[in-house]
Amino acid sequence: MVVLTSTERLVETNGVTLRVYEAGEPGAPVVLLAHGFPELAYSWRHQIPVIAQAGYHVLAPDQRGYGGSDRPDAVEAYDIHALTGDLVGLLDDVGAQQAIFIGHDWGAMVVWHTAVLHPERVRAAAGLSVPPIPRARSRPTERWREKFGDDFYMLRFQEPGLADAEMEADVAATMSGMFAGLLTGRAPLPEWISADEFEHYVTEFSRTGFTGALNWYRSYDRNWESTPQLADTKINVPALFVGGTADPVGPTMNPARARELVAGPYTEQWVEGAGHWVQQERPDEVNRILLAFLTEVEKS
């Protein structure tokens, strides 16, 4: 089992308490790692020590709704302003003005939004599996219904309690299905995760449930309604997108449109044969890509 070679502590910020894993020297440039759905800071277990050893101060929180962090009851507590505010608050906690933000899946969406909602705090931004995409012209749930129909999983996630109960009925089946690239149903564990590593996820989500995580999806429309200014806002810092060529998620988000949002230096890297959980599936390749990006950012 790979363990987190870092210090764990609780940080009070932005009205919540977050469990944060921290590695590297205080005062060094900060790299903040934001996990996705349904993950934990543990999903960065292969990146935290490598980035810290490269000379960075690494912060990897369980984001609100997950793991050892607070799980507010109100759906409104999970909007994009709260989520980006949490990450900015972690910079305040360590006395850093800026950080290089790296996110996976939903964490990537939070990172891209941090770059436009709090540009003064972002030195550079990287997203794994979810590219920077411009603001939609219509409400997300309306667009999904038109494009995918009423049975689309993100629409099913909108109903409080429904998906929560289904996923919590058998957490091991939920997580194995997710990691195998399915939305439901037990599946054999992929080779990239050990039984002990898998059990870490099962134990945590058995304790916390999935409601906090699903509330991120239930905030999609609210996020769209509260950010009309993003239609004319660009990401001006260095940006990186890393995708897996076997990931069913990334291509559906049309990474070719990234340049509509990113005005600064932009790099796109694909990991051949990798699926959605790219930083866990192919840690060595992803680490090489991330370290090269960090080096380029430091030069700029």
Task: Specify the residue positions occupied by each region the protein language model found.
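Catalytic active-site module of serine/aspartate enzymes centered on a nucleophile-bearing elbow/loop
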Residues: 265-300
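Signature tryptophan residues that serve as conserved aromatic anchors
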Residues: 37, 41-44, 106, 112, ...
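Conserved HGGG/HGGXW glycine-rich cap/lid loop of the alpha/beta-hydrolase fold
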Residues: 21-70
